[in-house]
C-alpha cells in the first residue's frame, strides 16, 4: 500500500509538500548497512507519537512507525532505487496539503487520519 501524507510534520521532515510512504510488514524490513537514529515526534495533530527513523550518517529519512500500527513500517519511497511502482493509493491529512498540490481523481483522500501523526 502506497500513500501520501500531507500533515505538517511530514512536510517538515521531508522538506517538501508531502511524504510518499509505502507500508510494509515490520518483519520484512532489513537494514543492509549503517546505523539508524530515531526522533520521537510527539507534537503531532493527533497527539500520538510518530517515530521517525533516519540514517545516522547522512540524515536521510528512512521510515516512520506509529503506535496504532505496531507491525507496520511506513518506508519513505524516495529511499528506494526504483520508485516507478509507487503510485499513490490514498492521501492522508489532505486538510493540511499545500494549496498548489492537486489530488488525483479517484484516489481516496482523508481530511484527517486518526492514529497516524
For each feature predicted by the language model, list its residue ranges.
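A short Gly-Trp-Pro
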Residues: 1-117
Amino acid at each position: 500500500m502506497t500513500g501520501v501524507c500531507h500533515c505538517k510534520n511530514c512536510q517538515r521532515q521531508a522538506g517538501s509538500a508531502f511524504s510518499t510512504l509505502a507500508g510494509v510488514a515490520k518483519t520484512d524490513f532489513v537494514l543492509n548497512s549503517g546505523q539508524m537514529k530515531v526522533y520521537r515526534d510527539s507534537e503531532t495533530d493527533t497527539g500520538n507519537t510518530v517515530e521517525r527513523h533516519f540514517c545516522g550518517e547522512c540524515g536521510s529519512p528512512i521510515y516512520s512507525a506509529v503506535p496504532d500500527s505496531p507491525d507496520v513500517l511506513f518506508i519513505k519511497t524516495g529511499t528506494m532505487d526504483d520508485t516507478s511502482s509507487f503510485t499513490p493509493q490514498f492521501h492522508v491529512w489532505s486538510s493540511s496539503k499545500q494549496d498548489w498540490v492537486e489530488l488525483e481523481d479517484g484516489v481516496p483522500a482523508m481530511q484527517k487520519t486518526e492514529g497516524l501523526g
